[in-house]
Amino acid sequence: MNRLEVLIPCYNEMATIEQVVSEHHKLLNDSKVFDDFKIVILNDGSKDSTLELITSLSKKLYKIEIINNQIPSGIFKAFNQLYNQSSFEWIYLTSGDNQYPAKILENILNNFENNFDLYVAKRVNKFEIYNLSRQIISYFYRFFCFMISGIDPIDPGSTKLLKKNLLNEPLFCRYLARDAEIVIRTKKKGYKVKAIPVEFGNREHGKSSATKLSVLFKTYFDCLRLFKYRFF
């Protein structure tokens, strides 16, 4: 079977999570691309009403599963937790803040071909959404990954639709650079990768941790592990 598992980590996303889940659920319920689907929501120790909202949603909509962490684990561990527990043939990880609305997955599904293994949502409107510092960080992240590995990760921080078996082997990276490594390793192994141009949205509530110095340093040091792909 061709089944899709949508993975949504969330932390204090009560303002957006209901819209995110409902719109993705409707899209997949109407779509004929996959034989079956489910939406797995990881509440990573939210302090607001996120858990109550998604619990209520799971009673109204079918094919929704909830994982609840009592204590926040952080975005990296939340990603890994979702990837590790996934069981369907295809997985798609998106955010609970609606920066990647359901129309992005819809765009990918409209361009879906069975002979591709990984679809990368390539954000074409970064200059409209990001401020200057965020643009610089995004540019150098991609450039640094390319210089270290010799392979273009396309848009390393963006969402992806991929076959679960691409994650069967352990990754070298130990932090957020794993997102880039997934694309780099997939291309290096000769699998087919397709970039889909998309427009993502502003983060309307909360604050991204991507620009924190501690996160940036850890991510860029993590990128150094990509050097192994020069000899892979």
Predicted feature locations:
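Cell-envelope/extracellular polymer assembly enzymes that use nucleotide-activated donors
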Residues: 3-5, 38, 181
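A conserved acidic beta->alpha catalytic loop
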Residues: 43-51, 98
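Catalytic donor-sugar/metal-binding loop of nucleotide-sugar-dependent glycosyltransferases
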Residues: 151, 173-174, 183-201
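Acidic helix N-cap motif at the loop->helix transition within catalytic regions
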Residues: 15-19, 48-57
